[in-house]
Regions:
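Short glycine-/polar-rich loops that comprise or flank the Walker A/P-loop
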Residues: 1, 73-74, 99-104, 147-150
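Hydrophobic anchor at the beta1->P-loop junction of P-loop NTPases
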Residues: 6
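P-loop (Walker A) phosphate-binding loop of NTP-binding proteins
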Residues: 9
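Conserved substrate/cofactor phosphate-moiety recognition/catalytic segment
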Residues: 12-75, 116
Length: 159
């Protein structure tokens, strides 16, 4: 039915958006199966998964394979990961197109300082956080054709 790819800086609210979207879609009259695919789905540690380029490439391969297995006209798949590489988002678009389903990119637009603040708050609560090195080297390649841009400064998210 649809493939939703959420992208943004580390700790920019992607998982919160994915969860809110999933709940809102489940509460709608849609009979579709809603599924979130993320690192936690495979019991992978986000810091190990993004520690170096090889690990990140392997993670993208695992996520892509799971998306490929999951896309269908009866499912709504939400991909909750950094999804920072334009070529990777294009690969996911190709999977959606081949399956004959819709494709949407949600970009969580949060300031870098806000992301660091949220990451630190999570660290204080002993929740899963990103290493500072991952936050420093993370850059989102150009996001063109965005259907929805979530900016936490200007938009109050209501689902």
């Amino acid at each position: 039915m649809a493939l939703v790819v959420i992208c943004g800086q580390p700790c920019s609210g992607k998982s919160t958006v994915a969860l809110c979207l999933s709940v809102a879609l489940k509460e709608s009259e849609s009979s579709s199966t809603i599924r979130i695919i993320d690192e936690a789905s495979f019991h992978l540690d986000r810091n190990q998964s993004y520690a170096n380029m090889t690990a990140e490439k392997n993670l993208r391969g695992v996520l892509r394979s799971e998306v490929d297995r999951s896309v269908s006209r009866d499912n709504i798949i939400i991909v909750d990961s950094l999804n920072s590489i334009k070529g990777y988002r294009y690969e996911l678009w190709c999977l959606a197109r081949a399956a004959g389903i819709r494709y949407c990119v949600l970009f969580c637009d949060a300031e870098e300082t806000q992301c660091k603040k949220w990451n630190e708050q999570r660290r204080e609560k002993c929740e899963a956080t990103y290493d500072d090195t991952i936050c420093l080297r993370s850059q989102i390649e150009e996001v063109a054709g965005i259907l929805l841009c979530l900016n936490y400064v200007h938009v109050k998210m209501v689902f």
